[in-house]
Amino acid sequence: MIMAKMDIRLSADQEKAAEAIISVIEKKANGTLRGEEMLLTMGGFAGTGKTTTLASAVGMVANRPKIAFCAFAGKAASVLKTKLERAGTLALGDYVGTIHGLIYRPRHGGSSGSITESDIDDKAPVERKPITGNTDQKMAFDLVDDIDQSIIVVDEASMVNEQIFADLQSFGYPIIAIGDHGQLPPVIGSFNLMEDPMIRLEKIHRQAEGDPIIHVSRLARETGRIPIGVYGLGVEKIQKTGSLAFAERIGPSTMTLCGMNVTRVWWNNFLRTRYGFKSNDPEIGERIICLKNNREEEIYNGMTGVITSIVAKGQHWYKISATMDAGNLYEGWCYKHQFGSVKTAFNVPGMPQWQVGDLFDWAYAMTVHKSQGSEADDVVVMEERISRTEDEWRRWLYTAVTRAKKKLLIVGS
């Protein structure tokens, strides 16, 4: 099968997957979609051409219904939008963005909107307000009444938890869920939408069979063990020792990944110092990562950017302007004590959720869970086994190494 618009020839497994996607779209358009056809799941490991197959299939259907293309993480949604635009897949009325932006609206008094200077309480106690790390944010959102599209495509579907999937299903529209069934499941609960996908892409397309990153990803996925050694130009694993000499290869554009938040905080502090940032406060030019969605400001969990201006206000806030990697400009009030904290400030005792403001932290290092949906040319992975089961470990390691596009350094044993 050849997708003429994109001049792409699909392989046999991609063609089978494309036909299944086309069937859902066409049956929805002519009203013949049966109940058991309301969900289609397509899985594929790194490099199998999942987005290419999706774009090809959608582009083959004339006069199709409007489609909502969405992903859990803002970064993943941004990457998806870029790929679909490049393929010429999008049509008038389609949606491309986060799941939260598609089906939720901030509840009055919730934590997902913006605060203004008038909301800043200068009389707040001067002591640092503790962060509890309570991650239950569901009370801050309500479901919208309906969406403008009649088909939902979920990318990076391995990140979707059971509650969000149930909310997506509640609209009664067919769902096409696409993801890498080798990656980590959602952080909360045992639900895994990609555990046993209905359709699987098997053949590697994104990079040559001999690509060292693909080889390393297979080792991670199949054995959970990557031996010490050099696997190709810029791709190697070294023994973890007490020396930090390897850190010299970490640059400002390197994605540094780890398993635990305490490790993330340590590396953020170490790299900040190395880059010449001496203050305990964030500074102009620093890389930051968003930790909480704010639709009003078009910032989403996992989105990264660079600070262009920053002013402290009161004891608990910064007024920050930043250029986000997705291309948008951010300006808003951020909770000061989130920077350098091990936990995320979803619940600050003595302060209403809406007054906490936006949540950012330094982005020189991040956990593998937070990196899902992102990719970088250069990646450094700090292996941290902690208490994971064998399957969890394989998924963690596989997810980590598949963030790399060109260079990969693994530090472990």
Predicted regions and their residues:
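Conserved adenine-nucleotide phosphate-binding loops and their immediately adjacent elements
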Residues: 1-8, 43
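N-terminal pre-P-loop "Q-motif" helix
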Residues: 7-29
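Conserved SAM-binding loop
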Residues: 10, 69, 177, 256
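Pre-Walker A (Motif I) flank of P-loop NTPase domains
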Residues: 30-40
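Short basic/glycine-enriched coil/helix segment immediately N-terminal to the Walker B
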Residues: 34, 112-150, 169-170, 371, ...
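Conserved helicase motor core of SF1/SF2 NTP-dependent helicases
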Residues: 41-48, 52-65, 71-87, 97-111, ...
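Core RecA-like ATPase module of SF1/SF2 helicases and allied nucleic-acid translocases
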Residues: 48-52, 74, 89-97, 105, ...
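Helicase P-loop NTPase motor core
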Residues: 223-267
